[in-house]
């Protein structure tokens, strides 16, 4: 049993290392491209306490670990030191698939209006995390990257209206993303009694 647990941890660590290195490489290549790709604008100011809590992933251009995600949720909690304790959970492959949990730490970049974070899965790599869109009510957000490699469309509810979805996907398209890579994340909480039933490892 202990051997099985250790093997699972090793496999997960290897996945995180691969994803972190890939994200860093994409960021490096973007920097080398100079002015070929414009910097994605940040929202002017983010009220961090108001931004904390659960965000359902509505659609994504995914990293390697989330290509088969179902019921994906990103949860943020503000630490006393100002970092962001992040818990990303989803079922892999199906609504009843194995639960996956990742717990990176967000580091808010100074003088960014709290809209630019470095998301650290493994030390010392911090992946770029840009809050490019946030509605006034803090109900919908878009997390983007200058490399245009990954993007996350998220909301406080598992589903959003067709009108809001079209608005947000159009926003992503206008940022310069390849929309053929966008995956709508299946969300079905009909068998859950409350948000507290979200997957937790």
Where are these regions (language model features)?
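Hydrophobic helical h-region of N-terminal Sec-dependent signal peptides
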Residues: 21-26
């Amino acid at each position: 049993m202990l051997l099985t647990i250790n093997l699972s941890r090793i496999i997960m660590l290897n996945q995180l290392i691969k994803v972190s290195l890939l994200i860093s490489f994409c960021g490096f290549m973007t920097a080398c491209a100079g002015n070929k790709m414009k910097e994605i604008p940040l929202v002017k100011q983010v009220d961090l306490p108001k931004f904390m809590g659960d965000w359902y992933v509505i659609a994504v251009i995914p990293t390697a670990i989330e290509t088969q995600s179902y019921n994906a949720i990103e949860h943020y909690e503000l630490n006393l030191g100002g970092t962001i304790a992040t818990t990303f959970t989803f079922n892999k492959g199906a609504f009843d698939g194995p639960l996956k949990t990742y717990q990176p730490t967000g580091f808010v970049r100074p003088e960014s209006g709290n809209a630019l974070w470095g998301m650290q899965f493994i030390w010392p790599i911090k992946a770029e995390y840009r809050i490019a869109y946030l509605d006034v009510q803090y109900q919908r957000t878009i997390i983007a990257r200058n490399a245009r490699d990954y993007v996350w469309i998220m909301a406080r509810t598992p589903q959003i209206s067709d009108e809001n979805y079209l608005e947000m996907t159009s926003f992503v398209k206008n940022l310069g993303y390849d929309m053929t890579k966008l995956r709508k994340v299946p969300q079905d909480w009909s068998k859950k009694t409350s948000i507290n039933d979200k997957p937790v490892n």
